[in-house]
Amino acid sequence: MRIGANGDETVWADEEFAGRDFRDEDLSRIRTERVVFTECDFSGVDLSESEHHGSAFRNCTFRRSTIWHSTFTNCSLLGSVFTECRIRPVTFVECDFTLAVLGGCDLRAVDLSDCRLREVSLVGADLRKAVLRRADLTGSRVQDARLEEADLRGTRVDPTFWTTAKVRGAKIDIEQALAYAAAHGLAVHGG
C-alpha cells in the first residue's frame, strides 16, 4: 500500500485479500492495481471516486455501498452481489460480471459496452438508456429488467431475453430484430 504525496490517495497494488471485512470503511479515492479480493464484505463501504485496474472482486458482497464516480478497467466482479448500492454515474471498461447479482440496481444510462454479463441476475434492474453495445448477456436473468431506450446493438442474448426484459424503444441491429421476432413466435420470410 502506498499513500499519495498529498495524503488523499491510497494505492493498493499486487495484493490479495480473502474473507476480509471492510464493512463501513471509507475507501473513497482508493486506487487498486491487480488486487484480488475474494469473498470480502464491502457492505456500507464508500468506494466513491475510486479507480480499479485489473483488480478482481470475486464473490464479494456490496450492500448499501457507494461506488459512484468510480472507474473499473479490465476488472472481474465474478459472483459478486450488489444490493441497495449507489452505483451511478460509474465507468466500467471491459469488466467481467459473470454470475454477479445486480438485481434491482439502478444502472440507468451506465455504459456496459464490451462487458461480460454472462449468467448475471438483472431481475428488476433499471437499465433504461444504458449502453450495452457488444456486451455478452447470455444466460442472464432479466425478468422485469427495464431496458427501455437502451443501446443493445451487437449484444449477445438468449431468446428468453426478448420475452422477459422490457425493451421498448431499445436500439437493436437487424440480427437482433429477427431474434426478437422469432422469440415472439413470428415467422419471418424474405420476399
Swiss-Prot record:
Keywords: Antibiotic resistance
SUPFAM superfamilies, alphabetized: Pentapeptide repeat-like (SSF141571)
Phenotype upon loss of function: Decreased resistance to fluoroquinolone antibiotics ciprofloxacin and sparfloxacin.
Pfam families: Pentapeptide_4 (PF13599)
Biological process (GO), any one: response to antibiotic
Ranges in a coiled coil: none
UniProt cross-references to InterPro entries, sorted A to Z: 5peptide_repeat, Pentapeptide-BTB/POZ_domain
Residues of the Pentapeptide repeat domain: 115-154
Entry keyword annotation includes Transit peptide: no
Protein's UniProt keywords contain rRNA-binding: no
Described purpose of this protein according to its UniProt entry: When present on multicopy plasmids confers increased resistance to fluoroquinolone antibiotics such as ciprofloxacin and sparfloxacin but not the quinolone nalidixic acid. Forms a structure that exhibits size, shape and electrostatic similarity to B-form DNA; it may bind to DNA gyrase which is postulated to protect it from fluoroquinolones.
Similarity-based family: Belongs to the pentapeptide repeat protein family.
Oligomer and partners: Homodimer. Probably interacts with DNA gyrase.
Record remark: domains: Each subunit forms a right-handed beta-helix with 8 complete coils that stack upon each other.
Name used for this protein in its record: Pentapeptide repeat protein MfpA
Organism, scientific name: Mycolicibacterium smegmatis (strain ATCC 700084 / mc(2)155)
Species classification: Bacteria, Bacillati, Actinomycetota, Actinomycetes, Mycobacteriales
Gene that this polypeptide is encoded by: mfpA
